[in-house]
């Protein structure tokens, strides 16, 4: 358990999640999703040991954000130590506004031996920028054209 609503797990956890879980995200490219029907689930494939692609990471963060407010979310990969941890770290930085150093410390305390993906901090920075641009565009669209236009 990383936070009260965010957990990380391995491939076996994705097949038989605890009943306290309401949503499950599988982030392992080499596995198919075999989650039970009672849990909301999705698969966003990341390659093991590769750098996180910012667009994929953004998609995963948005999915976790969408489901985390009303569910405990379990993010799984093969071992539950790399890709799943990286997605949770990105969520905590980009959505919860935590500093990367604080998130890293939290994750290492809660999940000793975790190995975030290479250059994760850079990818998280890109995701935060994508999210900011999206929010600005939405705000601009919602406010309509300027007066006199």
Predicted features and spans:
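A phosphate-binding catalytic loop at a beta-strand-loop-alpha-helix junction
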Residues: 71-89
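Cysteine-based protein phosphatase catalytic domain of the PTP/DSP
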Residues: 1-72, 93-126, 132
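A charged, well-structured terminal subsegment
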Residues: 131-138
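Residues at secondary-structure transition points
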Residues: 15, 86-88, 148
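Positively charged N-terminal leader segments that act as targeting/secretion signals
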Residues: 140-148
């Amino acid at each position: 358990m990383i936070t009260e609503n965010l957990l990380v797990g391995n491939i076996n956890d994705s097949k038989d999640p605890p009943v306290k879980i309401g949503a499950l995200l599988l982030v392992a490219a080499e596995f198919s999703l075999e989650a039970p029907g009672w849990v909301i689930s999705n698969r966003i494939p990341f390659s093991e040991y590769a750098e996180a692609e910012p667009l994929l990471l953004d998609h995963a963060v948005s999915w976790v954000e969408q489901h985390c407010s009303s569910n405990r979310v379990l993010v799984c990969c093969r071992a539950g130590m790399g890709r799943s941890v990286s997605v949770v770290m990105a969520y905590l930085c980009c959505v919860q506004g935590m500093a990367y150093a604080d998130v890293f410390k939290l994750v290492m305390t809660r999940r000793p031996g975790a190995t975030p993906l290479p250059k994760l901090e850079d990818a998280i920075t890109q995701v935060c920028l994508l999210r900011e641009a999206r929010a600005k565009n939405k705000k601009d669209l919602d406010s309509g054209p300027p007066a006199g236009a």
